[in-house]
């Protein structure tokens, strides 16, 4: 039986789930990059679904040590011919959401988390543009963003965003490379 939690705890739980799905996105991008850049390793990897070949695992570990943004940038570059501008926009949005979650101010005393973008006004404007944020006249100065994933519509919107990449984009790219999606996802 699932117990109903107070909103602050529910927000932390749902935010944690979203964060883990962004980690899954990063891992899948990693496998797609490795497979595209290393066709011989890909063949060995696909041929042994229950055991990851040592050389392939070494490549994975190299990517596990990288930040999401570095993996995302390489992924977008390597698959530039196969990604639509909308898919790149969605992956960028996932990157921003991951950073927001990772750097949020968390409290179990309120039903939202706060995130303060860093990097100056230019980067703030890019974040606002990439996420489609509409600032009100009463917006905090400096800008603070609320994370309210306890709200079902907010959680569902992010879930749909991630699903559009994992279930459409990644499946298509894996098929193009001849990799069973279940092996990398």
Q: Where are the language model's segments positioned?
A:
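Amphipathic alpha-helical interface elements
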Residues: 1-70, 85-96, 100-113, 147-185
């Amino acid at each position: 039986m699932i117990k109903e939690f107070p909103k602050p705890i529910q927000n932390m739980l749902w935010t944690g789930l979203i964060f883990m799905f962004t980690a899954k996105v990063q891992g899948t991008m990693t496998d797609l990059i490795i497979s595209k850049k290393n066709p011989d390793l890909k063949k060995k990897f696909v041929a042994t679904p229950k055991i990851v070949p040592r050389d392939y695992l070494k490549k994975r570990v190299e990517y596990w040590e990288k930040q999401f943004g570095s993996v995302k940038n390489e992924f977008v570059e390597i698959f530039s011919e196969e990604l639509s501008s909308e898919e790149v926009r969605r992956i960028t949005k996932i990157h921003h959401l991951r950073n927001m979650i990772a750097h949020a101010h968390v409290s179990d005393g309120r039903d939202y988390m706060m995130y303060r973008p860093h990097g100056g006004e230019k980067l703030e404007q890019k974040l606002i543009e990439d996420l489609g944020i509409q600032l009100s006249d009463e917006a905090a100065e400096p800008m603070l963003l609320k994370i309210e994933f306890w709200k079902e519509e907010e959680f569902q919107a992010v879930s749909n965003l991630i699903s559009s990449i994992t279930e459409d984009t990644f499946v298509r790219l894996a098929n193009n490379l001849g990799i069973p999606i279940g092996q990398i996802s």
